[in-house]
Amino acid sequence: MYIIRCICLWMILGLMACSGPVRIQKNLEVKPEIFPDYVDVTIPPNIAPLNFKLKDACVEARAILECGPEKLEIKTGKDACFVIPASGWKRLLRAASGNHLNVTVQAFVNDEWIAYAPFIIKVAKEPVDGWLAYRLIEPGYELWNRMGIYQRNLENYTENAIIENKMSGNNCMNCHSFCMQNPEKMLFHMRETYSCTLLIDGDKVEKLNTKTDQTLSPLVYPSWHPSGKYVAFSVNKTKQAFHMNDRNRVEVFDSASDVVV
């Protein structure tokens, strides 16, 4: 029991030692290189915490985010990944709406604390739409047997599936589109197994066979009329070609195309 108490005491003392201010021995004139690069960007006031990583190697690091009286300090180890708590982030954004955050990154490198030149993150007054829909697929050119269409809450990064292709024979699905950003009215295509276009209007779901003798292909790229009564589609005969030397390896081109409504 005595040993356990001693260990706990040392842990508490260690945490107290880490939580105090650090003595900066060198101030740099360069801004930190971080990933993703949020230096001097503009963000909406309702975006989820923008976690980031310091690219430079270090033993430990700190990030100080400030706006007026609101201040948030995040500490990290040698991985230099800053994970921003949601509650503190929301307070900062409320204070910085229409203004900006000041961000200072400090790092312990070569047995001394250095401070990078501060940078700002501008905060707009206008909020962003809360949800984003996208297709998620492994990077590459040929493999597509695992994919899905997902939606993500941009205010907290919660993600859930609209549909995954494990429900439809691991086929390809693509070109999802909403009418005027209305989640109640959307469409997307299924390829290979269960080939069709699915049209969703509220609780009504229609499966459409869109290949005819008069068109080049099934429907491809959509564009909604604002009324939601019409959709213009391209029909295409597409091919892929691969470059041997260029870093942009794949080239997609049309051999023929048309537009239908």
Residue ranges: model-predicted function:
Residues I34, W113-Y141, Q214-T215:
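Low-complexity, Pro/Ser/Thr- and charge-rich linker/hinge segments at domain boundaries
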